[in-house]
A protein has these predicted regions:
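Short, conserved active-site entrance elements at the starts or edges of catalytic domains
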Residues: 91
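A short, N-terminal "cap"/entry segment at the start of jelly-roll beta-barrel domains
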Residues: 1-87
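A short beta-loop-beta micro-motif enriched in histidine and acidic residues
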Residues: 79-88, 99-116
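Glycine- and acidic-residue-biased ligand/ion/polar-headgroup-sensing regions
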Residues: 95-96, 108-110, 114-132
C-alpha cells in the first residue's frame, strides 16, 4: 500500500472517529518529527506492546474488501511479563463491505462495542487444544 493511501485511510478514520466522539490519546497524532524528538525509553511500553495505528489488508492486496484500520490503546504481554494485562483495548474502523479473518486468543479478553451504528456480524466458535 502506498504511503498516500495510508495517509488517506488515516484521515478518513480520524473523521469517522470524530463523528462518533471517539477520543484518541495525543500520540495518535504525533508526526514523524515528533516521534524522533521523544526519549525512546520513556515510551518503551508503547513500542513493546505495539500500541497505536495498524492498517492491514491481512497479507493481501484488497484492503477495501478484507481489511481493517485499528488503534490499539491498551495491550498486555502474551507471557504476562513485564506487562501483566490480559485485556486489549482497540478501536476499530471496519468499512462497509470489509471483512476481517477469524482469530482467537488463549489468554486475552476482548469487549466488542459497536459505536458506529452499522451492522456488526460476529461468528463465535470454541477451539480445541490443537487450536482448531
Amino acid at each position: 500500500m502506498k504511503r498516500s493511501e495510508v495517509n488517506q485511510i488515516l484521515k478518513q478514520t480520524g473523521h469517522f472517529f470524530a463523528r462518533h466522539h471517539i477520543q484518541l490519546p495525543p500520540f495518535a497524532r504525533f508526526t514523524p518529527q515528533r516521534w524522533q524528538q521523544l526519549d525512546p525509553k520513556a515510551w518503551q511500553e508503547l513500542f513493546d506492546l505495539k500500541l497505536g495505528w495498524d492498517i492491514t489488508a491481512f497479507g493481501g492486496n484488497h484492503f477495501f474488501t478484507q481489511g481493517l484500520t485499528l488503534f490499539t490503546l491498551r495491550n498486555g504481554s502474551v507471557s504476562g511479563t513485564p506487562y501483566p494485562k490480559c485485556y486489549a483495548e482497540k478501536i476499530m474502523h471496519v468499512r462497509e463491505g470489509q471483512v476481517t479473518p477469524m482469530h482467537f486468543h488463549w489468554r486475552k479478553q476482548e469487549d466488542i462495542i459497536n459505536r458506529g451504528g452499522g451492522n456488526l456480524i460476529v461468528e463465535l466458535w470454541n477451539s480445541d487444544a490443537f487450536e482448531q
